[in-house]
């Protein structure tokens, strides 16, 4: 048992987040995403989170993992297909609020890839987390940033 680890994050997912390096990516995939096929073809790690949606996992992951500050948009969604031009994507507003809570760039940190470009980027991911999310166009790719040193940590060590 550990303190301050969101309960949604499995030990395997926490391990994957720890093993990821700067600029590595993780896919938070909805229930319809071909995660198993992509992971199998690329040798990527596939983790299951069937009982959870993408928004709650996004919130839990960003509590631990910083977003990359060396790129303008470290969070990427899948663009709507032309046939879905008129389709509302309400989960986007949820993502904007969650990202803004953890990153000062807010909604500006969120970009999009065309559908097939998204699949190509997903093939490069360190890890794919397949969720039970049923919202349309709910897939995300997150790019990991760097952990900043805690200046108070050394001071605490010196007290002992």
List each model region and its residues.
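Long, hydrophobic N-terminal alpha-helical segment
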Residues: 1-50
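Generic structural signal for well-ordered, non-membrane alpha-helical segments
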Residues: 6, 10, 50-54, 58, ...
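Structural motif
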Residues: 24-27, 43-46, 68-77, 106-109, ...
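Short, solvent-exposed amphipathic alpha-helical segments in soluble enzyme
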Residues: 32, 37, 42-44, 62, ...
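Gly/Ser/Thr-rich active-site loops/lids in small-molecule metabolic enzymes
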Residues: 44-61, 153
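Short C-terminal domain-edge/linker segments immediately following a structured domain
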Residues: 56-62, 77-80, 157-160
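Glycine-rich, aromatic-bearing surface loops/beta-hairpins
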Residues: 82-160
């Amino acid at each position: 048992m550990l303190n301050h680890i969101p309960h949604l994050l499995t030990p395997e997912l926490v391990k994957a987040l720890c093993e990821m390096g700067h600029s590595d990516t993780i896919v938070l995939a909805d229930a319809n995403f071909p995660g198993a096929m992509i992971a199998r073809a690329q040798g990527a790690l596939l983790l299951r989170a069937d009982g959870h949606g993408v928004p709650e996992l996004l919130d839990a992951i960003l509590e631990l993992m910083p977003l990359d500050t060396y790129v303008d948009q470290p969070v990427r969604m899948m663009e709507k297909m032309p046939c879905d031009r008129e389709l509302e994507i309400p989960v986007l507003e949820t993502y904007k609020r969650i990202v803004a809570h953890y990153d000062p760039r807010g909604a500006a940190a969120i970009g999009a890839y065309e559908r097939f470009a998204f699949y190509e980027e997903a093939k490069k991911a360190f890890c794919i987390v397949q969720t039970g999310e049923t919202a349309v166009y709910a897939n995300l790719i997150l790019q990991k940033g760097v952990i900043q040193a805690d200046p108070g940590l050394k001071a605490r060590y010196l007290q002992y």
